Structures are given as structure tokens and as C-alpha cells.
Design a protein with these regions (language model features):
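Helix-turn-helix
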Residues: 2, 15, 19, 23-57, ...
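Hydrophobic/aromatic-rich alpha-helical bundle segments in the mid-to-C-terminal region
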Residues: 124-130, 145-192
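Alpha-helical DNA-contacting segments of helix-turn-helix folds
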Residues: 59-66, 73
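Hydrophobic alpha-helical connector segments
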Residues: 61, 75-102, 153-156
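Secondary-structure edge/capping motif, primarily at the C-terminal ends of alpha-helices
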Residues: 81, 117, 167-171
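N-terminal intrinsically disordered/low-complexity leader segments
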Residues: 1-11, 192
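Amphipathic alpha-helical packing segments from all-alpha helical-bundle domains
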Residues: 68-71, 87-90, 120-144
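Amphipathic alpha-helical segments used for helix-helix packing
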Residues: 101-123
Length: 192
């Protein structure tokens, strides 16, 4: 993905951020140099550094943008897959299948970035923790209000994260991840 793929009406900052998003997600944060982002966003170094004084600033903006984008998709996908009907927790399986089968799927941007930079950039841990908590909160909203609602939501979120990591391995792993997630969610449904 490069800046040509983004509409010319976008500001330089938006082109930089969208280009970084695509490059960081597809190739990793550490492996993607600022010069590549600058070239593909078709901006000058001066323009880049005016908007993002350091790569760390760009990483934070990338994670914030990814969080907003992914959460909007997640809520929408859950609704499309039946989260508003009876077995609401079961909507997680087709939602994850939709994501896993996307040709650009490369796992969770937050898990990936924490594994790359969590020990050296504390903001990555903070943003990623917020993302995972927000995901858990959305899952909790699928559940009836019972005393163990939060415990079930936390367990479901952990199962989702495990499926996300497993699905990165290959196509066979995607199927196994979805089957395992389905089994775990069925067990959690019995706890309600």
C-alpha cells in the first residue's frame, strides 16, 4: 500500500498515518523505517517531522488509529453476525472468521507491537492494554447482566486473543483457532 492508494484530498498527516498503518501492520513496526513511510506517503522529511517529531510519536498515532478503526469494525461485525440475537456470545466466531479470512490478516496489531516494543516503549503497553480492555467491554455487553458477567467476558477475550495468535500460523491453524474458540465459547455460554 502506498500514498497513491489514498485519496489526494487527504492531508499530509493523514497520508503519513495511513501509510504507516499499512506498512506497520503488514511488515512490523521495527522493520518499517521512517524513510519508507516518507517515500510511500510522498511527503518530505520536513513535513513528516512537523507532524510526527519521532517514530515513537508515529507508533502511538498508529496504535490510536488502529484502535478506533478495529473497534468500529468489531462492533459492526458482531452485529452483522448475530450479536443482537439470542446466542450473542456465539457471534464472536463468525466475526473472527471474517477477520482471519481477510487476505491482509496479520494478527492483532497490538499483540504484535507489544511483542516488538513493549519492553522499550511503555506507551505501547498502555495503548494496547486500553485496546484489550475495550474489546473485553464490548464482549461483556454481549452477555446478560449476571454476577459472573465480567469473568466470562475476560475468559472470552482471552480465548479470542489465543485464536488471533493461533490463526497467524497458516490456513489450517485458522480453522483450528476457530474450532477451539467455538468450543471455549460454548463452555462459557453454559456458565451464564
Amino acid at each position: 500500500m502506498n500514498a497513491e492508494d489514498h485519496t489526494p484530498e487527504l492531508s499530509a498527516r493523514e497520508r503519513i498515518l495511513l501509510t504507516a498503518h499499512d506498512l506497520f501492520y503488514s511488515g512490523g513496526v521495527r522493520a518499517t523505517g521512517i524513510d519508507k513511510v516518507i517515500a510511500e506517503a510522498r511527503v518530505t522529511k520536513v513535513t513528516f517531522y512537523r507532524h510526527f517529531p519521532s517514530k515513537n510519536d508515529l507508533i502511538r498515532a498508529y496504535l490510536d488509529y488502529r484502535h478506533e478503526r478495529w473497534m468500529n469494525w468489531f462492533k459492526d461485525a458482531l452485529n452483522r453476525h448475530g450479536a443482537t440475537n439470542g446466542q450473542r456470545l456465539n457471534a464472536l466466531v463468525p466475526t473472527m472468521a471474517e477477520w482471519f479470512n481477510n487476505p491482509i490478516y496479520r494478527g492483532c496489531a497490538f499483540i504484535n507491537t507489544v511483542s516488538e516494543l513493549g519492553g522499550v516503549l511503555p506507551d505501547v503497553l498502555e495503548i494496547s492494554s486500553r485496546h484489550k480492555q475495550d474489546m473485553t467491554n464490548v464482549i461483556a455487553e454481549l452477555l446478560p447482566e449476571t454476577p459472573n458477567r465480567l469473568a466470562i467476558a475476560n475468559a472470552a477475550a482471552i480465548a479470542v486473543d489465543g485464536a488471533i495468535v493461533k490463526a497467524q500460523l497458516d490456513n489450517n491453524a485458522k480453522l483450528a483457532a476457530l474450532q477451539g474458540l467455538s468450543m471455549l465459547l460454548s463452555a462459557l455460554n453454559m456458565q451464564q
